[in-house]
């Protein structure tokens, strides 16, 4: 009998991903795209490398980049240029917003997110010593408005995080659901943080974005990391009501200062000349969708359950009935088959029998992972 693996402290994502980086294998653990960025973007980077762009960027973001972002959204939404803030990826955007909430609300800060919740949503409250509530979706992956309202009021929830498509479970929230959450935020006076990092990776219809409903209670977060396969560039942005502009910028000045200058200049050039990366995003989306379809079929044949999924770059899968411990399964899968995945308990204490697999990888790599998982289960 295999000796049970010891659970690490900290992020399971970092733990399993670092195993691959140190010892090799297939990394389906961390959300790292397995594709090169657009060639035109890399050419833009080469073209600006000798320009005077190697010092601090403006704290609010490169002005040309902000202009390109604003122009893109202004086609469909009533957005104001000055309400955008460029930051060091969506991770900084989330932590910046949460730090701002902590300053505003202090001990009254209670946060909620829907199960399974992305790690930042639960770990930020933990770092600050604040309450976090993990709210389960219904059997059909919807939510009861009355029960949700009751949870908000009874627990004094002040912040709700929602991502669309989600991570680890790729639910795309419908227009009606998003508007319901916004109406509740305005009515019950909590802050809704809408995380749209995966909004280009949808399988059917584009996700609904709440940029026409921005009020003092609604915040919007996005990033170029996944959209353009540049997770190492650390360029993201947020949009918030002008009421919060000064407060967010002040905190950003001291905990983030500015996003990388060279990358911002290159991005501004590329996005402005190549339709905001639309062609690249379309091709990338197709590859991820194909990987989802192919790997889902294989996993289903092996006894996994894959819930209806609308987008994102992950498969959220329930383990076969004979396997009940996702962490031990993930540990053995890596040690014996060299495939790194993430145990579901990292995202929800009640999902110990689930796992997350990154599908934003080359098709050949996904195929190799399928073969290794199949072989591993055949001899387990």
Feature locations, PLM:
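Glycine-rich loop-to-alpha-helix module at the N-terminal edge of alpha/beta enzyme cores
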Residues: 53, 68-71
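Aromatic- and carboxylate-lined catalytic core of secreted/periplasmic carbohydrate-active enzymes
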Residues: 63
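PLP-dependent class I/II
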Residues: 2-10, 14-48, 60, 71-380
């Amino acid at each position: 009998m295999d000796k049970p693996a010891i659970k690490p402290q900290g992020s399971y994502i970092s733990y399993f991903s670092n195993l691959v980086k140190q010892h090799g294998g297939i990394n389906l653990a961390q959300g790292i795209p397995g594709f090169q960025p657009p060639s035109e973007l890399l050419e833009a980077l080469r073209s600006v490398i000798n320009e005077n762009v190697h010092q601090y960027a403006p704290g609010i973001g490169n002005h040309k980049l902000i202009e390109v972002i604003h122009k893109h959204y202004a086609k469909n939404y009533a957005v104001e240029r000055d309400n955008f803030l460029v930051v060091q990826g969506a991770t900084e955007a989330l932590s910046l917003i949460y730090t701002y909430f902590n300053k505003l609300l202090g001990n009254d800060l209670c946060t909620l997110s829907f199960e399974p919740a992305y790690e930042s949503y639960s770990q930020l409250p933990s770092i600050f010593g604040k309450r976090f509530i993990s709210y389960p979706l219904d059997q059909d992956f919807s939510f009861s408005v009355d029960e949700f309202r009751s949870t908000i009021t009874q627990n004094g929830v002040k912040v709700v995080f929602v991502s669309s498509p989600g991570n680890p479970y790729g639910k795309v929230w419908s227009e009606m659901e998003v508007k319901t959450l916004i109406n509740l935020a305005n009515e019950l006076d909590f802050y809704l943080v809408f995380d749209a990092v995966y909004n280009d990776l949808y399988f059917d219809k584009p996700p609904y974005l709440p940029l026409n409903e921005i009020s003092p209670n609604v915040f919007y977060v996005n990033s170029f990391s996944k959209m353009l396969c540049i997770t190492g560039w650390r360029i993201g942005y947020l949009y918030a009501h002008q009421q919060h502009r000064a407060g967010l910028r002040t905190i950003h000045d001291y905990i983030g200062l500015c996003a990388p200058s060279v990358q911002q200049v290159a991005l501004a050039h590329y996005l402005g000349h190549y339709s905001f990366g639309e062609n690249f995003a379309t091709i990338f989306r197709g590859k991820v969708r194909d990987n989802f379809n192919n790997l889902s079929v294989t996993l289903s044949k092996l006894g996994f359950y894959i819930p209806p999924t609308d987008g994102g770059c992950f498969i959220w899968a329930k383990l076969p009935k004979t396997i009940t411990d996702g962490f031990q399964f993930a540990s053995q899968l890596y040690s014996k088959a060299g495939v790194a995945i993430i145990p579901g308990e990292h995202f929800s204490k009640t999902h110990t029998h689930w796992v997350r697999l990154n599908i934003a990888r080359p098709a050949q790599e996904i195929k190799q992972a399928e073969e290794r998982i199949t072989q591993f289960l055949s001899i387990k």
